[in-house]
């Protein structure tokens, strides 16, 4: 009879299921995991330190690059902290736009998570379906900011610009003939709000497609049910937030418990799980996409009926419009000062947190009364989840390790910062 041996091996950082540059030192007894030691820091870019050497308005772009799948949600946390220090409130239309794009970002994140999670476990079709829908939502990003990912769209006091009246259209190419392009452009004939409305009308049926492939699939359930279980009490002790905490049965969502933007004006439900396993995390995120779709439709209805300003009218914080700057000397001076030294933030400290797709994303800023922050501390949502890897994986098979990693939904941009 062959002897069962203990091994210690490296998982990652170059591994397709590592979701970035994750390195795990895994100790196994035969094929059963005994201990896991996560090693982080391979994607460290000193974002918090960089923020100390840049004016406040130049750090917004760094936030996009932390969790680079939840771009605008990261920006939201940062600008909320600045708004607290400045004592300003964005216009109500800007709040609704932020709420709408936070939920678009949530769907973008969950679609990538679902596709990658399914692919890690061995289901390829869902991955292709999810990326089909992500293209439409990235077009929304591009319409308001010109960028498909790193938008830098939120500003202290509002958003960069109002929603456009037209959508970018596809042109015939080597990959898409005229017939295909015509079909793709059907929903792009109107405004951005028309395009989003069309998407939200189609999206629930598309979620049903994903569920028909996975939810009752025997192999999917064998790979996820009872895997990586964390109880509600233990999840709270470990500092879990977001879908990871809600899957364990704790009804905690900052959008409901500490409302920001326009979340106190829209109607939605918080999905929670019971078992705290990989399967419950999947079900919670699927239902979150349905609730996000519901929130987006409410925002579109309100935005259609209520035009108005999307950023405060204060030249000491917000640059004047180009046509005003060209003819008014005082506006030109404000414009020059804002783009050279930025704005001065009063001395003090502020913490702002948002319900980012992965959990609570918090930004703590200390100001010494200058145009640059004295200290910026980012609370990454995925950090406590990765720290609990040893506890979640102990006693499971090596194959279950991949399912647990992908159920956490980690992005190393925010963990390593």
Curated annotation (Swiss-Prot):
Q: Which SUPFAM superfamilies match?
A: HydB/Nqo4-like (SSF56762)
The record ties this protein, via InterPro entries, to: NADH_Q_OxRdtase_suD, NADH_UbQ_OxRdtase_49kDa_CS, NDH1_su_D/H, NiFe-Hase_large
Could you say which EC number(s) this protein's record lists? 7.1.1.-
Q: Is Chloroplast among this UniProt entry's keywords?
A: no
The question of whether Nucleotide-binding is a record keyword is answered with no
Keyword annotations for this protein, in alphabetical order, are: Cell inner membrane, Cell membrane, Membrane, NAD, Quinone, Translocase, Transport, Ubiquinone
Q: What is its main location?
A: membrane
Q: What Pfam families does the record point to?
A: Complex1_49kDa
Q: Which reaction does it catalyse?
A: a quinone + NADH + 5 H(+)(in) = a quinol + NAD(+) + 4 H(+)(out)
Cellular component GO terms, alphabetically? Answer: plasma membrane
Tell me the superkingdom of the source: Bacteria
Instruction: Kindly give the membrane topology term recorded for this protein.
Output: Peripheral membrane protein
Protein's cellular compartments:
Cell inner membrane
Q: Which GO terms describe its molecular function?
A: NAD binding; NADH:ubiquinone reductase (non-electrogenic) activity; quinone binding
Describe its function. NDH-1 shuttles electrons from NADH, via FMN and iron-sulfur (Fe-S) centers, to quinones in the respiratory chain. The immediate electron acceptor for the enzyme in this species is believed to be ubiquinone. Couples the redox reaction to proton translocation (for every two electrons transferred, four hydrogen ions are translocated across the cytoplasmic membrane), and thus conserves the redox energy in a proton gradient.
- PANTHER family under this entry? NADH DEHYDROGENASE [UBIQUINONE] IRON-SULFUR PROTEIN 2, MITOCHONDRIAL, NADH-UBIQUINONE OXIDOREDUCTASE 49 KDA SUBUNIT
Q: How does it assemble?
A: NDH-1 is composed of 14 different subunits. Subunits NuoB, C, D, E, F, and G constitute the peripheral sector of the complex.
* Family note: Belongs to the complex I 49 kDa subunit family.
Query: What's the protein here called?
Result: NADH-quinone oxidoreductase subunit D
Species of origin reads Coxiella burnetii (strain Dugway 5J108-111)
